[in-house]
A protein has these predicted regions:
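Cytosolic catalytic domains that perform sulfur/thiol-centered chemistry
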Residues: 1-129
Length: 129
């Protein structure tokens, strides 16, 4: 489930990594945090990372925020990110481990087998780079 930052660096060095690995920033904050994760993502993110928008990857027909998406909604959103069943998805968040477990759990809920969370998130990445 967890991948360490030093192992992720080794994957980046291997030129073949882009064939199967998709890196997602799943950062999200409560409204009172007064932080905008999409803006933060645009300013700084892991190389080649994509943004996993929990507001979009939820059941948009519900009146409640961040409800579990249907399987079709989840698959549609993952296909837009270029993710398929063969992808090894590595998820991180800006604040340590924060919100990345929620994204990991959604992948596991819908039977995606190869998904990991970057242990320590962006903080761990920056600590060794």
């Amino acid at each position: 489930m967890l991948i360490e930052a030093n192992k992720l660096i080794k994957l980046y060095i291997d030129k073949e990594w882009k064939k199967n690995i998709v890196i997602l920033d799943a950062s999200w904050y409560l409204p009172n945090a007064k932080r905008e994760p999409i803006k933060e993502f645009k300013n700084t993110h892991l190389p080649d990372a994509l943004y996993f928008d929990i507001d979009q990857v939820s059941d948009t027909s519900s009146n409640l925020p961040h409800t579990i998406p249907t399987k079709n909604q989840f698959e549609f959103n993952m296909q837009k990110l270029g993710i398929n069943n063969d992808s090894h998805v590595i998820i991180y968040s800006m604040d340590g481990i924060g919100t990345s477990p929620r994204a990991w759990w959604l992948f596991r809920l819908y039977k995606h087998k190869n998904v990991s969370v970057l242990n320590g998130g962006m903080k761990a990445w920056k600590a060794i780079n």
